[in-house]
Amino acid sequence: MKKILFVAFAFAAIAVSAAVSEKVVLWRNGDNGIKSFRIPALCTAPNGDLVVACDARKNNAGDLNVFQPINITLRRSTDGGKTWTKPENSWTWTWNDKEKWSGSDPSFIVDEKAKKIFLFYNVWKWEDTKTWDNNVYRFYVQESSDNGKTWSKPRDISADISFPE
């Protein structure tokens, strides 16, 4: 009996490890003109879909304090990670001669009761490209009520989570 159980568990372990060992590349540095993808976050949506986000760093792997456009890019899987939607930005931050914004460091919270996914991240608005002194570091949230298919506009929550000045 012990041998039968051992063999059954061994086959189960092999089957599980084979199922999870398939490699899927979600982002590759250089894709779509993006030099670096960093800081992934993953969650399971209320319906069981997988949602993943990461930084799409246009020019290099540098952080928010490195002068460059950074967006949060998302993908979704409805089959346990075997296939994924095309990458799309949760929001495309403005980067032009008048305004320069970057978003970075995504994280998720899933509210099972409300059936919502919340996507949190940092945002940097560049006011002065030579020093850090005049630049503004903010915290934003977006939410999805349809398991990550669509997202609300970004909402600045900095005042809600910061100490009063």
Where are these regions (language model features)?
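Asp-box/BNR beta-propeller blade signature and adjacent active/binding-site loops
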Residues: A19-E165
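Sec-dependent N-terminal signal peptides
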Residues: I4-I14
